[in-house]
């Protein structure tokens, strides 16, 4: 093909990564971002790759599949992971970032590339020519209508909920202790211990609190990885005690005693003045949020700088619509990337943008497109979302279960995952030399 310009719609994690991968390969990019001309219900700035949920990109170790995915992306010169490494804040074995510095870094990196032209306007029709659609879970109504017409499929709806962010200075540090679970990495989390009585009182308040009403035509489907805390609470006390409030590995550093339940807070900014409440994504009404959070030991006088909010997430039925190259099956010059493909998570979204960007570049250069092998975390995600059961398709995080099985079965989980990680990184390093 002679066309040397690619349209990228959306400058979130996936779109920014796709634009970067295209630009560094000499391709001219028209990057469309409707913010700040038109905002979404969850975004607050005009920056690229704004994080609207947690500030954590999850595990940074090779013992976890998402850690392997990050390492693969580093080998492929990911703009998102480079910015995250640059803007990291203490988070034990995880990679968490100062969300404002991170978004600014990605914006500067992508916007200042000579091959990238940024156009701040809403795209209401899918353009002709090579295009990557990375408009995310909050795709505008106009473009959603176009996509529905294009795909011939009904959208699937579910909700992501963002956790509240609080001021550290408002916490009672006499009741809170610093520790990471099982003492992994540096002590990076503030822990609020609860007795059984305190937990029961908190659980009762949480289950009786009022939530923001949903529109009648919207169907509630919660993805397990970002379930609102009040929905979790209604499933039963044990759901919380085995979930975000589990006390295992968080024994008090002075007494050595294990609390009945623990609420963890994670640093949210580089200065260490703001903390988010881990796993407490919510769509409670704001007044109720504050009253419920005040029942957590140490948060009696909490100052909330950003209340938890809930927003719709939208994703397409990728198994019926996409190839492992992230190409649309019925139009070879159209690609999709990000959460709307059914990959779930910041890193997974960026990784899909990386693959779509590389393959869109290959397409316009007349080269063979890349299908990353299932031995890699990147390839296993692409394989999963394009080959799994169409009827029950749900979003998926990176995990070792998606990777191609090892030639020899290893019973020990730690050793098995180590083998998965080593094989994935060796494979991606070989591939990186050819693309």
From Swiss-Prot:
FAD binds at residues 10-15. It holds the Pfam family GIDA. Its EC number is 2.1.1.74. It catalyses: uridine(54) in tRNA + (6R)-5,10-methylene-5,6,7,8-tetrahydrofolate + NADH + H(+) = 5-methyluridine(54) in tRNA + (6S)-5,6,7,8-tetrahydrofolate + NAD(+); uridine(54) in tRNA + (6R)-5,10-methylene-5,6,7,8-tetrahydrofolate + NADPH + H(+) = 5-methyluridine(54) in tRNA + (6S)-5,6,7,8-tetrahydrofolate + NADP(+). Keywords: Cytoplasm, FAD, Flavoprotein, Methyltransferase, NAD, NADP, Transferase, tRNA processing. Signal peptide: none annotated. One of its GO terms (biological process) is tRNA methylation. InterPro entries: FAD/NAD-bd_sf (IPR036188), MnmG-rel (IPR002218), MnmG-rel_CS (IPR020595), MnmG_N (IPR040131), TrmFO (IPR004417). Its cofactor is FAD. One of its GO terms (molecular function) is tRNA (uracil(54)-C5)-methyltransferase activity, 5,10-methylenetetrahydrofolate-dependent. GO terms for cellular component: cytosol. It is found in: Cytoplasm. Homodimer. Catalyzes the folate-dependent formation of 5-methyl-uridine at position 54 (M-5-U54) in all tRNAs. Belongs to the MnmG family. TrmFO subfamily. This is Methylenetetrahydrofolate--tRNA-(uracil-5-)-methyltransferase TrmFO.
């Amino acid at each position: 093909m002679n066309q040397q310009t690619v349209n990228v719609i959306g400058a979130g994690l996936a779109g920014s990564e796709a634009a970067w991968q295209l630009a560094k390969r000499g391709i001219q990019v028209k990057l469309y971002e409707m913010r700040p001309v038109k905002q979404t219900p969850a975004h607050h700035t005009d920056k690229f790759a704004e994080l609207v949920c947690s500030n954590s990109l999850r595990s940074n170790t090779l013992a976890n599949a998402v850690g392997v995915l990050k390492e693969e992306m580093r080998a492929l010169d990911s703009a998102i992971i480079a910015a995250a490494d640059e803007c990291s804040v203490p988070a034990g074995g995880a990679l968490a970032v100062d969300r404002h510095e991170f978004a600014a870094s990605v914006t500067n990196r992508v916007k200042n590339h000579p091959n990238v032209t940024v156009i701040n306007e809403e795209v209401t029709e899918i353009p002709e020519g090579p295009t990557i659609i990375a408009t995310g879970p909050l795709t505008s109504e106009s473009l959603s209508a176009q996509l529905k017409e294009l795909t011939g499929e009904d959208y699937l709806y579910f909700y992501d909920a963002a956790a509240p962010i609080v001021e550290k200075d408002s916490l009672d540090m006499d009741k809170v202790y610093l520790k990471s679970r099982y003492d992994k990495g540096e002590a990076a989390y503030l822990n609020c211990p609860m007795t059984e009585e305190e937990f029961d009182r908190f659980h009762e308040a949480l289950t009786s609190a009022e939530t923001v009403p949903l529109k009648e035509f919207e169907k509630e489907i919660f993805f397990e990885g970002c379930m609102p805390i009040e929905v979790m609470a209604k499933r039963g006390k044990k759901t919380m005690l085995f979930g975000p409030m589990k006390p295992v590995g968080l024994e008090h550093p002075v007494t050595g005693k294990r609390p009945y339940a623990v609420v963890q807070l994670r640093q949210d900014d580089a200065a260490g003045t703001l903390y988010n409440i881990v796993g407490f994504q919510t769509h409670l009404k704001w007044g109720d949020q504050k009253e419920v959070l005040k029942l957590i030991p140490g948060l009696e006088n909490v100052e909330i700088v950003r209340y938890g909010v809930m927003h719709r997430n939208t994703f397409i039925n990728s198994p019926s619509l996409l190839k492992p190259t992230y190409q649309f099956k019925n139009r070879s010059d159209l690609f999709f990337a990000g959460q709307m493909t059914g990959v779930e998570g910041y890193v997974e979204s960026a990784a899909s943008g990386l693959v779509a960007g590389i393959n869109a570049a290959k397409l316009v250069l007349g080269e063979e497109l890349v299908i990353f092998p299932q031995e890699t975390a990147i390839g296993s995600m692409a394989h999963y979302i394009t080959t799994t059961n169409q009827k029950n398709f749900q979003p998926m995080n990176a995990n070792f279960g998606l990777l191609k099985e090892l030639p020899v079965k290893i019973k020990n989980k730690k050793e098995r995952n180590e083998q998965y990680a080593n094989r994935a990184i060796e494979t991606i390093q070989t591939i990186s030399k050819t693309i």
